[in-house]
Amino acid sequence: MINYTSTFTLNRQKYHYIDLVKASKDYDIELDSLPYTIKILLESLLRKHDDICVTKNNIETLFHYNSKAPQGEVPFKPSRVILQDFTGVPVVVDLASMRDAVVENGGSPDLINPEIPVDLVIDHSVQVDFFGNQDAFDANIDLEFERNNERYEFLKWAEKTFENYRAVPPATGIIHQVNLEFLSDVIINKDGFLYPDSMFGTDSHTTMINGIGVLGWGVGGIEAEAAMLGEASYFPIPEVIGVRLYGELPKVATATDLALKVTQKLRLENVVGKFVEFFGPGLAGLSLADRATVANMAPEYGATCGYFPIDDETLNYMKLTNRSAEHIALTKEYAKRNHLYHDMTNLPSYTKIVEIDLSAIKPSISGPKRPQDLIELGQAKEEFQASLVRQFGVRGFGLGADELAKKATVHFDDGQELEVKTGHVAIAAITSCTNTSNPYVLLSAGLLAKKAVERGLSVAKTVKTSLAPGSKVVTAYLRKSGLQPYLDKLGFNLVGYGCTTCIGNSGDLVPEVAKAVQEKDLLVSAVLSGNRNFEGRVNPLVKANFLASPPLVVAYALAGTTNIDLTSKPLGYDKNGQAVYLEDIMPAKEEVLSYIEQFVTAELFEEEYGHVFSDSQKWNQIETENSKNYQWNQVSTYIQNPPYFENLTNTENKIDLSALKVLAKFGDSVTTDHISPAGNIARNSPAARYLEENGVTYAEFNSYGSRRGNHEVMMRGTFANIRIKNELADGKIGGYTKYEGEILPIYEAAMNYKKNGVSTIVIAGKDYGMGSSRDWAAKGANLLGVKVVLAESFERIHRSNLVMMGILPLQFLDGQTAESLQLTGYETYTVELPEQPQVHDIVKVKATSKEGTKEFQVLLRFDADADIRYYQNGGILPMVVRKKLNGG
């Protein structure tokens, strides 16, 4: 094994590092011909080279990277892992369960400990129950701790018992913003040895960290657990798409508008499973916060990551966010020596180059059901109206032409009566790390609110307004600048530091509005500064959801409707009866920049992050036991020991793939929200019945996301989204299917199949599993007895999660679909999987019905050799436990 370590001295300190320049000479390649992300992967392989997980062949293959047709796979070990609590609780539950399994099989509980640093940020549990007043924040936090006491006690136990594990307490910030502003070192200095920060996160928007020059992406909790326990993550060497940015953003456009445009454009380029790198002269004009907004939305454009290389702006941001001067100097020196510092004169070899003219970006929103459906602001009214009557699907609601005329009169207790019409803005939320990490758009929203209040405008009480920033720094500069009182005046009071509306924790609508929506079947809207707007995600009563920049969120709240052209119609009328237009109160770019210069300072970051792990008194007061193994509470409805290790043996699993029945048949764009919802638990659902049988009242249901530590709730919640459309349910929308001629909840049908020893298959269209990195979408399917998913295409993370839970992902061959093969879903299926399957094998499937048997071929979506090992072990979790017990 050749040693490629080099040394340099900076400020009289000696540092060591893996020298890519030295290694590239040995392999006779031009280092600067490689994309930055490939160089980061190479450094990792050289550093982790052990001839077991990482071989010389892996290194050679990557050094000779062929951008036009990459071959081979990467065994990648990230530097660290970050968790949020919705996905983090099941990760810690699995670790605790692994400890039990190890002990039961004669091993030590200490075999199960994270081998790399792990940070858990608790941000997904706070809900917007209270809003629109000064007490909302405290009231929501009190309720959050009350609802989640069991979960928080469990996470506190984990902090005490596991090595290499820290928890950022509730009411501190949003995972990706805290990661960007505080947790990431960009370049890690471990006892004088330097290497790039790289990471996995159990949240798809982990990609935000690529804005600061750190390679990272979202993985399922299962893959994160494996990485934490020392396993490499195997994936095909990716294509790298270069996105050349040129020109300059117009004064009226924001980073949000750019991110939405990038999402639209790259979705059309089909960058799923590919790396994206941004370069070009336009890069210099983008602040780091702008880059982070674009990087955050990589899951929406489908890429594994959207990477911005380290440059002067990276260092400026590190200084702003109070990283030490010594570490900033070290970051620059290391990045330059290892050719990881952006070089404008060099063009790496990309698979393809896509060009985006920044000067052509216009104020926009996206919706009503997908982030990639971009609408220029001037066309928003026209597009909203068209979506109402367009055929039901990802861009339409399939309603009648009379829908626009629908309205209801809302009666308030104080005697006030207000009219609510189709398109009413029921929710206006400044939310999500995507935008609240960006001072430009937050201060723009504050300045717009100031000008609106000064003109006498107000927001109707039928609109639920909220402000939930991703860090305390945001509220600090909004207060310091004097803008928060104006936001408060319009109802955008602080409701919490967490994901809230962006992930479906929007709370109930204004009760009077909710009543009107249900009684009149009104189609109402949400406008949020989030990153996802899939149907049913934001609020079950809100069908049309639009992503917008924070200033546009405030503007739509003032207008009160999405059935309006904000570029030509007034938002309202001032105290003199004069019309007030958006252009009248939208702040000028120079004004916003002057506020940033005055009020966004390193001192704020120092103050707010100085004691981030110990500041929360509520968290500090939680008492927990001191034990290596968790003492499971059998009556808990939040935390239960999952059954993944009940049949743990040393033999590999043989899985019968004959006589499979179809549990569900879906169309295109089925998201992980559809498969495993995170939001409210519907009153008439199987999960609700389980909770009620265990003494939980409706008021205490909490959300699916908060109950991910209990497999009994989660398996009942699988395919239970109220908006999911199963083609086997005779037109009934929601989590239903046909079982022996009867329409049943999918959970009940699955249990009937299991009771009778029948395994199942799910059939789907394109982009199956798009959206959040939700491992429960695979875990739940596994517990329901699903053995195979056959789809036209898969989103990257979900395909990986399926394999890691022992579910076989099969893909229709190009040009074939369930429809073209005339598959109804009422057949019985047999998959002829070879005894020794290989990556991307073509396998035969038989579908038998009364009419006879159809045979067709499909693509086996094992994308790496590791997938085969995971599948043959019944999943990665049993495999890891076996390895630990065998001294691996």
Curated annotation (Swiss-Prot):
Pathway the protein contributes to: Carbohydrate metabolism; tricarboxylic acid cycle; isocitrate from oxaloacetate: step 2/2; Organic acid metabolism; propanoate degradation
Domain of life: Bacteria
Keyword 4Fe-4S in annotation: yes
Record GO terms (molecular function): 2-methylisocitrate dehydratase activity; 4 iron, 4 sulfur cluster binding; aconitate hydratase activity; metal ion binding; mRNA 3'-UTR binding; mRNA binding
Chain residues that bind [4Fe-4S] cluster: 433, 499, 502
Cofactor-binding details, from the entry: Binds 1 [4Fe-4S] cluster per subunit.
Reaction it catalyzes: citrate = D-threo-isocitrate; (2S,3R)-3-hydroxybutane-1,2,3-tricarboxylate = 2-methyl-cis-aconitate + H2O
Record GO biological process: propionate metabolic process, methylcitrate cycle; tricarboxylic acid cycle
InterPro entries, per the entry: AcnA_IRP_Swivel, Acnase/IPM_dHydase_lsu_aba_1/3, Acoase/IPM_deHydtase_lsu_aba, Aconitase/3IPM_dehydase_swvl, Aconitase/IRP2, Aconitase_4Fe-4S_BS, Aconitase_4Fe-4S_dom, AconitaseA/IPMdHydase_ssu_swvl
PROSITE patterns for the chain: ACONITASE_1 (PS00450), ACONITASE_2 (PS01244)
Record keywords: 4Fe-4S, Iron, Iron-sulfur, Lyase, Metal-binding, RNA-binding, Tricarboxylic acid cycle
Cofactor names: [4Fe-4S] cluster
Top enzyme class: lyase
E.C. designation(s): 4.2.1.3, 4.2.1.99
Family matches, as Gene3D superfamilies: 6.10.190.10, Aconitase, domain 3, Aconitase, domain 4
General function of this protein: Involved in the catabolism of short chain fatty acids (SCFA) via the tricarboxylic acid (TCA)(acetyl degradation route) and probably the 2-methylcitrate cycle I (propionate degradation route). Catalyzes the reversible isomerization of citrate to isocitrate via cis-aconitate. Could catalyze the hydration of 2-methyl-cis-aconitate to yield (2R,3S)-2-methylisocitrate. The apo form of AcnA functions as a RNA-binding regulatory protein.
Family to which this protein belongs: Belongs to the aconitase/IPM isomerase family.
Record text on subunit structure and interactions: Monomer.
Protein name: Aconitate hydratase A
Record gene name: acn
